[in-house]
């Protein structure tokens, strides 16, 4: 297909300083100063915070409106030796967030447990069947990680059984919120927490920090922020604001990590901890962590991250590496089959592509959908077909909210969830055709046409000679580089 690439210079925000002020204040290369002018940094103090961020730059966890209520319930549960279950998600973000809360809470009580649903048996999020099992284990408090914000029915059911639920989630909210004991989600309506793009692991980390501050529990925050960093990079949230701070600190802390799982994962990927980058986490570490949840069961990955038995950890890393190789093979197969259909039918014939196949592995379709969306610059939805209820995964393009598009057809779905860039859902096979029709109608009515020109932005134009040793050294201060911080 024809590529529609348009390059535009990023708009400079109004600021009370000149590039010359930046050069003088921070002893930076003049070209670097002009690049900083394109960032959303209104004052020289903002620039200082951006360039030299540390733990003190993290936002106050107590800005979450519901966090005191969550802390009080957790404190009471620990003091009363109640059974607590941390119920996470099976992707790298959910696994890291679950590990964070399990590590800190289990350091206080032996009645703390971690559980991830099986993608193929229970599917995403809380279910009434799982709540029954937790009730049978005398659970009185569930803390969700990276899920729960749409589990209205399930949390009502838990409440009737006498189980309190604290939700930590970053996905988009529906009109009706669950009647949970406490909800920590920056996207919650009227939520005052100022940074809205935290991932699930980062929210779990913020809750852990608040526990430490309130002396409810204590733990090495260097290890916890390293796990939050992995979740942040793996979930491809914008590397701006607090996310960039978490990634920056975590990439520094991983250099001296004592976590055996991280040490063995880096060794398996042939990575030097002292030279590890955001790309290494995103393309080498995160896929290995994701592999179990995509292809089998991720609960052993939790055990691996919490174990001090090197032989056990080494064996689990080896298994993950093999599973990841199988995942790569499946992903390439799905991509090739889908791309062949698209090319045969003309890539421009749809605003949103919806493709289904009974042989497509439901744990891998999201990755393939992301590659296709990037290649053809339009949203892609891939569905793993079955005789009745099918599983789908959606990936979007910049500027088009796929969550809202899917929500517009929620009456055709069994369940769904996600955010502006990605979503997952279950759908009856008989509804797929109508679902595709409505999605494309919605896309047309909401102006997707103007987004199909793949606009790429750059920060600065300069003459030859920009790449001095000083400039190359200074540019590293903008790292870590990733989504929304190229």
Predicted segment positions?
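Acidic-glycine-rich active-site phosphate/pyrophosphate-binding loop
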Residues: 75-76, 172-185, 344
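Hydrophobic, well-structured modules enriched for small/aliphatic residues and gly/pro motifs
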Residues: 91, 148-151, 158, 165-173
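Intrinsically disordered, low-complexity regulatory tails of plant transcription factors
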Residues: 151-152, 235
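Hydrophobic helix-and-loop "lid/oligomerization" segment in the mid-to-C-terminal part
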Residues: 2-4, 11-141, 161, 212-437, ...
């Amino acid at each position: 297909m024809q590529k529609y690439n348009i390059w535009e210079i990023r708009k400079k925000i109004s600021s009370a300083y000149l590039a010359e002020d930046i050069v003088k204040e921070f002893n930076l290369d003049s070209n670097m100063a002009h690049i900083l002018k394109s960032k959303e940094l209104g004052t020289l103090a903002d620039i200082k915070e951006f360039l030299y961020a540390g733990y003190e730059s993290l936002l106050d966890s107590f800005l979450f409106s519901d966090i005191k209520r969550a802390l009080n319930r957790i404190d009471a549960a620990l003091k009363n030796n109640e059974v607590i279950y941390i119920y996470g998600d099976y992707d790298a973000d959910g696994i890291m967030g679950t590990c964070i809360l399990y590590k800190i809470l289990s350091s206080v009580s032996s009645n703390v447990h971690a559980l991830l649903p099986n993608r193929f048996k229970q599917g995403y999020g809380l279910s009434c069947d799982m709540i029954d099992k937790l009730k049978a284990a005398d659970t009185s408090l569930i803390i969700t990680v990276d899920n729960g914000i749409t589990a209205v029915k399930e949390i009502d059911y838990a409440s009737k059984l006498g189980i309190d639920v604290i939700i930590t989630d970053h996905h988009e909210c529906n009109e009706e919120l669950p009647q949970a004991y406490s909800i920590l989600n920056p996207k919650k309506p009227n939520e005052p927490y100022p940074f809205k793009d935290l991932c699930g692991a980062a929210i779990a980390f913020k809750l852990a920090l608040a526990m430490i501050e309130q002396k409810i529990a204590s733990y090495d925050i260097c290890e916890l922020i390293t796990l939050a960093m992995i979740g942040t990079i793996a979930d491809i949230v914008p590397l701006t604001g607090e996310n960039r701070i978490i990634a920056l600190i975590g990439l520094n802390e991983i250099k001296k990590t004592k976590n055996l799982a991280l040490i063995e994962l880096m060794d398996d990927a042939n990575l030097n901890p002292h030279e590890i980058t955001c790309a290494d986490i995103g393309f080498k570490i995160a896929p290995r962590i994701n592999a179990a949840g995509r292809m089998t069961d991720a609960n052993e990955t939790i055990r691996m991250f919490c174990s001090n038995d090197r032989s056990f950890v080494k064996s689990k890393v080896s298994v993950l590496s093999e599973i990841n190789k199988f995942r790569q093979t499946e992903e390439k197969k799905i991509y090739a089959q889908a791309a062949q259909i698209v090319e045969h039918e003309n890539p421009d014939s749809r605003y949103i592509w919806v493709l289904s196949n009974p042989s497509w592995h439901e744990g891998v379709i999201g990755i393939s959908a992301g590659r296709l969306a990037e290649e053809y610059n339009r949203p892609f939805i891939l569905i793993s077909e079955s005789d009745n209820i099918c599983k789908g995964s959606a990936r979007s393009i910049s500027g088009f909210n796929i969550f809202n598009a899917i929500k517009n057809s929620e009456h055709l779905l069994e369940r769904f969830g996600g955010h502006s860039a990605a979503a997952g859902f279950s759908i009856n096979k008989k509804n797929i055709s109508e679902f595709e029709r409505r999605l494309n109608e919605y896309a047309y009515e909401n102006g997707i046409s103007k987004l199909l020109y793949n606009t790429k932005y750059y920060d600065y134009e300069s003459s030859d000679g920009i790449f001095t040793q000083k400039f190359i050294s200074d540019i590293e201060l903008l790292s870590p580089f990733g989504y929304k911080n190229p």
